[in-house]
Amino acid sequence: MTYSPTQSPLVTRRAFCGGLTAAGMMAALPVSRAFAQAAYPERNFRVIIPTGQGGGAERLARAFDDAWSKLLKRQFEYTFHPGAAGQIGYELFVKQREADGHNLLFGNMGPEMIMYAVQKPNYRFPEDFIYFGRTDIDDSCVFVRNDSPYKDIKSVVEAAKKKPLNVAVSRIPHPASIGMLALGEATGSSYNLIPYGGGNPTYVAVMNGEADIGALPITGVLSLTSQFKVLGVFNKENIFAGITENAPTINSAFGSSIPDLYSSRAWAIHAKWADANPENFALLQSTAEQAHASPEFRDGFVKTGSPVESLKFGDRQVCTEYANAMIELAKRYEPVLSAQR
């Protein structure tokens, strides 16, 4: 059969009917199967970080996405929305970002679940969003600048029995803030918590003497050991004793029974998308776990000055259990947290 280049090629009846049959089969398939070959993710990810730029969350997220972006073959684009102890960023994520699997949040589950319990914002966990990729476990600690007059945690408590000490914290609803309030209750000492909206400005406040002491997650402090000294840790064990001059646990120093207080950062996504797209969500979670185990991420994390021992991956179930535990802890300390606001 021949035809002119200016004419349409002839189509046989068999080919035409076959084409209709194939089209009909595609139309009959569920959308998820009909477009199974459409690659997810289809574009870059947009990430909200609900704290200020330049802090520990940003450093950790960027080190992580160096490995994750290669697995997903997409880049990560960040915006920073501090304020109201993280509430502003979460409300923006839940209410204004499309639940399409390409919008993520990278948050600090500990303080942000405490904020959720205390401030009672207009969104719901886990109905509106879920955490699925925990990156680390970060114990809360008390620290000072290296030339501080306070050389150990007992000297801090003795001074705070005479007058309230100013404590720089990243935010009031935070495990480290609960630790300071619980320390005050246990020892009869007094602390004035001053929130600075993120780790970086908190370090600056301690460094320039605006605050007497600081209380933050330990890994960021350990990345700045040339400037700061850890005095005590809110956990049953100080796993970094060798690089903190054997700083004691708070409970061992005072015979108290303060619960373990640690933060865990994690990726979050809209719950309705995750539940409606189980295969794509499984891809997101499995590649997150692969990225976490990769030498590239661990090398990048170490380059931030943070100790690799704190890296511990957690899936959706692990994250949900931790988040719910933080909500219960916040309810226990809600009266004193509310009094500090």
Region locations from a protein language model:
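Solvent-exposed coil/turn segments that connect beta secondary-structure elements
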Residues: 109-111, 137, 147, 219, ...
